[in-house]
């Protein structure tokens, strides 16, 4: 049995940090030690920021984004084209698309993908909210921006089937060769998708 080398408060900090995606037990220990060493500059402000987030963060009732207001900043922005909705799996995907700055539209966060093997069905995702938004009218295009996984594609097909009779344009992101990518390094699935989604130049 391993000996304890620190108090329960620090052990708890390490255990909680280890639950953050991307941090295992070893990385969590390093992060905890760094925070403790920089107690005034990092640990205190981080604890305060986390408390504020716990008190103030809300899930947008319209799109599923996280913010401190409801509806969120994206939904409340009247400069956006609210007739186009980009459908994403997770909030991190919404943020990634916003960083790219390619579109100035509305979003809808599903909260995951359909996965029968994991017991995730349509009722477990924010699909009903999407159907309600589209059914209310004023939407001309839905851009399905889910990951190119089996679950992502199954989710895209399910949404397309559910909304096919509403007379809106439904598109999805192109899949294929990334900018700066070399063909020799791409897998067969990516190359096949790129060939099928080829465009005229």
Curated annotation (Swiss-Prot):
CDD domains: TOPRIM_recR. It holds the Pfam family RecR_HhH. Residues 83-178 form the Toprim domain. One of its GO terms (biological process) is DNA repair. PROSITE patterns: RECR, TOPRIM. Gene3D superfamilies: 3.40.1360.10, 6.10.250.240, RecR Domain 1. Keywords: DNA damage, DNA recombination, DNA repair, Metal-binding, Zinc, Zinc-finger. GO terms for molecular function: DNA binding; zinc ion binding. A zinc finger (C4-type) spans 60-75. The keyword S-adenosyl-L-methionine does not apply. Belongs to the RecR family. HAMAP family: RecR (MF_00017). May play a role in DNA repair. It seems to be involved in an RecBC-independent recombinational process of DNA repair. It may act with RecF and RecO. This is Recombination protein RecR. The lineage of its organism: Bacteria, Pseudomonadati, Pseudomonadota, Alphaproteobacteria, Hyphomicrobiales.
């Amino acid at each position: 049995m391993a000996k304890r080398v620190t108090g329960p408060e620090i052990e708890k900090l390490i255990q909680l940090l280890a639950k953050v995606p991307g941090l295992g037990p070893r990385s969590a220990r390093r992060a905890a030690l760094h925070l403790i060493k920089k107690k005034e500059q990092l640990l205190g402000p981080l604890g305060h920021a986390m408390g504020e987030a716990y008190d103030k963060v809300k899930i947008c009732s319209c799109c599923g984004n996280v913010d401190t207001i409801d509806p969120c900043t994206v939904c409340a922005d009247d400069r956006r084209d609210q007739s186009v909705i980009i459908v994403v799996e997770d909030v991190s995907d919404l943020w990634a698309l916003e960083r790219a700055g390619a579109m100035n539209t509305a979003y809808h966060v599903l909260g995951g993908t359909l996965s029968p093997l994991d017991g995730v069905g349509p009722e477990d995702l924010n699909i009903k909210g999407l159907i309600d938004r589209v059914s209310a009218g004023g939407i001309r295009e839905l851009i399905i921006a889910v990951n190119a996984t089996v679950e992502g594609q199954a989710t895209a097909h399910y949404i397309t089937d559910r909304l096919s009779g509403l007379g809106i344009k439904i598109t999805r992101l192109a899949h294929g060769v990334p900018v700066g990518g070399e063909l020799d390094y791409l897998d067969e699935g990516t190359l096949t998708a790129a060939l099928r989604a080829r465009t005229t130049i």
